Amino acid sequence: SKVVCLNSATAAEELNLRVCGIQEGDEVIVPAYTYTASASAAIHCGAKVIFVDSQKDSTEMDYDKVAEVITEKTKAVVAVDLGGIICDYDKLYAAVESKKHLFRAKEGDSLGARIQQSIGRVIVFADCAHALGASRNGKMAGEIADFSDFSFHAVKNFTTAEGGAST
């Protein structure tokens, strides 16, 4: 029920990252198999992108490798729901929870710090640009991750020629 519309999914992802206080010195995990915008939004925030390979015979990122690359600098992981196939968020959340002890939320009272303190672990973002209307295990794209973004570009499932949304 809470949606912000923007000019693109890239802008929506960058907004989500900035609202959560992602900045220079932070690490953001992104799948190696994705569109450039999944990583460039983090770069625009000044964060270092850590790429994770896909699973064998799948476009989904390898969740064991996600857990392996989480450090004290990791603040976010961006899952990409590609071609209407929603990532296995149960496995992704398990990977993130297994490294919860490494998470260091920002200090202070800024919105980003409060969000990080409230969540208390690496924040899970979903790039749902190719998944509007898709579901997995009874949950729709956009309602599984902590923050999600959608695209309404001309080649997407639902188009307005351009545009994006953040949930």
Over which residues does each language-model region extend?
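Active-site phosphate-binding strand-loop segment of PLP-dependent enzymes
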Residues: 57-160, 166-167
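Alpha4-beta5-alpha5 switch/output surface of CheY-like receiver
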Residues: 37-38
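Phosphate-binding glycine-rich loop
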Residues: 1-27, 41-43, 51, 100, ...
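Structured binding elements
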Residues: 46
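Nucleotide-sugar donor-binding loop of glycosyltransferases
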Residues: 26, 32-34, 53, 128, ...
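Short glycine/serine- and small hydrophobic-enriched flexible loop segments
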Residues: 18, 165-166
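Structural detector of well-ordered beta-strand residues that form the stable sheet scaffold
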Residues: 4, 29, 50, 123-125, ...
